[in-house]
């Protein structure tokens, strides 16, 4: 992680009558995790003790910050009371304002209360030790709606001595920009202050200063030594325990992209807080993309651990990579953990044989919530490789049912080394997508030899050529297992767009679109679940989200939420989504009339620019273009009429002149 201060400046500004007014400078950037503040990049001061962390504990709490200092009355020419208006940088919120230092002849300068500012302005006060070593009380006002702050400073004396009649005011702001906190981007924040008269009517001077911040809130690591074929990874999420923006509906979700040669043990996932207490999390895993999603509590440092198996043969070296990042913010804001040359060894002699019968186990997992699934029946077939085809061996079959997500193949059916087994799901639980796939696994062994037998080598080569994850070579008996996932049907939501009057442009518009699931057609009450779909600039593919853990016997309703978080139930009314005017339409796939949905349905939510149809033209034109065209025609007619009248008048005058 890194932080930078760029573009910082100390500029002195003057009033119109030549009085030297004030200047703003960046003192530095820092992080605060509730225990200690750490300088990220020093500006004009690297002393972290100048940060009032006790004040932050009562306002914005943990996070990454920039600290600015405003020097008022440097030349000592100001007299009386003045206001300072603070424009908080976009993507930040005010942490606090405090009087930090008094010049020798400015000991009587204080902050004062103000009346009549309006309901949006809230008064704040803090007490901290200033740089003069005395307890200092500061009162200021903050308008969260406009993200502006005000402080009134009084009792200045114009002694006309440089810096002795001045005071320093510290302004500390916390980063709230999601692209910085979740996306890992660097952003320059511009702070602007305005010196005003006592009543705020006259703006006397302005000053500005900038600071750039960049700080990763995710980390990932692996141990220096490995336990055979497995690796235990550690993810540290929200390293500062700060309040981060939600990025998955009303949730905070991270994405962990496992390398293609890694097999996740989903039952090994554990999450704890910084004190070592277990934390409730939500998990989902996509076996097709080898991607894990974990939703975590906000405002907590969460430490997640899990193990993976590296699916490679022993005694060879390979690169292993595993990347974590925040959902909807791409790979840039995460941490890519790379092991450049992972390898492992089997026991001496090149054999893992303990008995003639390795024990095959099957795990059945709900991929949408990572819960074990019971009552699923699997058929197991003994097979052999015949040329380039796997064929079942007559009579070599058994079946069994999962309990707590696990089925262990037992006697009288016996499994052997160097033998292919086909695993196939027989029954699909209610509410889940049917899986007709066959999964193949072989546990290979050298049988106390220096190398595998030729037929075993052929099986390994055949499995390695397959491009999907339904073929597994287990190089040890401890790895002789399969994890098979089922996806819930749920209720699928697809996002669509109509961007022009002709209805021919369907390119996604960048932004985050939010959807709520309700149990009533009015969209009243709080949504049962909230999901989001995010498009970045340039993305064109169709995107979906899915509501899960639903009752198949209940009817539901899906509504997009507007910028105020309200369900859009009126499909003829223009609404604001992502600060753009749209008409939102809902269509249940296969049912063009009903808005009611049940488990297994797909809802297409279309955002359309509002258009009107011109019957005379038989085509669709945007209303604004139509009105503009009519206005242009009217203006042209008026101009032509004026020209005609002037011409007639001129002709008559010429005739009279003759």
PLM feature spans:
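Solvent-exposed loop/turn and edge beta-strand elements of beta-rich ligand-binding domains
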Residues: 1-658
